Amino acid sequence: MDGFCDQQVPFMVPGKSRSEDCRGRPLIDRKRKFVDTDLAHDSEELFQDLSQLQEAWLAEAQVPDDEQFVPDFQSDNLVLHAPPPTKIKRELHSPSSELSSCSHEQALGAKYGEKCLYNYCAYDRKPPSGFKPLTPPATPLSPTHQNSLFPPPQATLPTSGLTPGAGPVQGVGPAPTPHSLPEPGSQQQTFAVPRPPHQPLQMPKMMPESQYPSEQRFQRQLSEPSHPFPPQSGVPGDSRPSYHRQMSEPIVPAAPPPLQGFKQEYHDPLYEHGVPGMPGPPAHGFQSPMGIKQEPRDYCADSEVPNCQSSYMRGGYFSSSHEGFPYEKDPRLYFDDTCVVPERLEGKVKQEPTMYREGPPYQRRGSLQLWQFLVTLLDDPANAHFIAWTGRGMEFKLIEPEEVARRWGIQKNRPAMNYDKLSRSLRYYYEKGIMQKVAGERYVYKFVCDPDALFSMAFPDNQRPFLKAESECPLNEEDTLPLTHFEDNPAYLLDMDRCSSLPYTEGFAY
């Protein structure tokens, strides 16, 4: 069993012996060692190049200030590829220390030359080729700087501000004044606050930050590379935001004015005319939309029929149309549509009591059914001379069938109604199971439904439908005008002087 290789399957290759397999092992082992050697050699060369690059970056970080120029990509690689810090010292919490995120980079210690490289490369804009930017180590001394292995090459900024590389930049503004060392009394609170190098060059000290909304917006875009900075979880109580958040905070006071302007856009003059508490144009400037809203009104037919007992307001109502709205009236006025159709050509219209208008909507013209009309006639003892109950259950007899037909014609505005037409309508109720014709007796009919159900359906809400009164004289079928002729005929356009103040005339055929 010792001679078998760990990957050999004996029954799959029966021709090979144990000795041959053992002799083939040294060749495989030599190949494996050769491959491993090549892999180790390649990886060593690869990582050797990376280590050389990293050493070059570290060497560049230790160059004196006047010769140092660190591009953006080098600062990114320095922070991302550098080993984690071994010792982290928590700084004192002061209001001025929250303005910068250099405390993240100061915790990296002496290995990086105390260069805050990442922050200033992301914050600073690209200078011209002839100028060299002011370097970030020109900050006040801090205990972290004093305890480091590599102290800053220059202790004060006024000496570094006089370097030849920074000479052309000094002509722009008073650079050394804001970067001078703080007084001894305030050094304990402001020692960890590095300042951006170009801030005194672009923002004078006497001008407020609110006057630079576009500059702050531009600085927020330049400081967006702060996102890849890895959060240091080892720092206790480190809840300070990143640097680009601090630089973009002056945008916040400038945000409410456009928001207020956006809310003010809703106060359109077209909307302000009806609001009682808002200033706006006078009401006469909005007459055209008011006229459109008045269009579906229904009182044009009532003004054309003078003898109809309409319950609409008339007279002085139309003269004050600018002060009131016509649709703010009683909703029961919209139940009437019975007095629109006249019955004579000469302008005589049927007289109609106003109680019919006060009823529920089922009493409108056309809604009263024939069986309901018959029950109403039977319920009134005054009609016993032409229709009455027979006394046998729900049977009733049309004593004068032509009179019943004539009254039904008055109710339905059909003066030519007769018993033949009425009897054909009654056959419809045979099929529906509402009434039947009593066999062997003429003009005798019978309701087949329950009496209580019959009267409850015929008189909803315990109110009897009001039937139309007798007309003055009999009319023929051809004497009745259709509704369309009535609307288009100018002979019926009466009381036009009362409607002159309205945007639309009453003669318009809707």
UniProtKB/Swiss-Prot annotation:
Binds to DNA sequences containing the consensus nucleotide core sequence 5'-GGAA.-3'. Residues 211-224 have a biased composition (Polar residues). It comes from the Eukaryota. There is a cross-link at K350 (Glycyl lysine isopeptide (Lys-Gly) (interchain with G-Cter in SUMO2)). The keyword Nucleus applies. Residues 368-448 bind DNA. Its main location: nucleus. The modification Phosphoserine is found at S248. One of its GO terms (molecular function) is transcription cis-regulatory region binding. It comes from Mus musculus. In the brain, expressed predominantly in the cerebral cortex, the amygdala and the hypothalamus. Within the cerebral cortex, there is conspicuously high expression in cortical layers 2, 4 and 6 while expression is almost absent from layers 1, 3 and 5. High expression is also observed in the dorsal and ventral endopiriform claustrum. Strong expression is observed in limited parts of the amygdala including the basolateral amygdaloid nucleus, the bed stria terminalis and the central amygdaloid nucleus. GO terms for cellular component: nucleoplasm; nucleus; plasma membrane; synapse. Keywords: DNA-binding, Isopeptide bond, Nucleus, Phosphoprotein, Ubl conjugation. Pfam families: Ets, ETS_PEA3_N. Residues 163-174 have a biased composition (Low complexity). SMART domains: ETS (SM00413). Belongs to the ETS family. Interacts (via C-terminal) with ZMYM5 (via N-terminal 120 amino acid region). The keyword Phosphoprotein applies. PROSITE patterns: ETS_DOMAIN_1, ETS_DOMAIN_2, ETS_DOMAIN_3. This is ETS translocation variant 5. The gene is Etv5. Residues 132-245 are annotated as: Disordered.
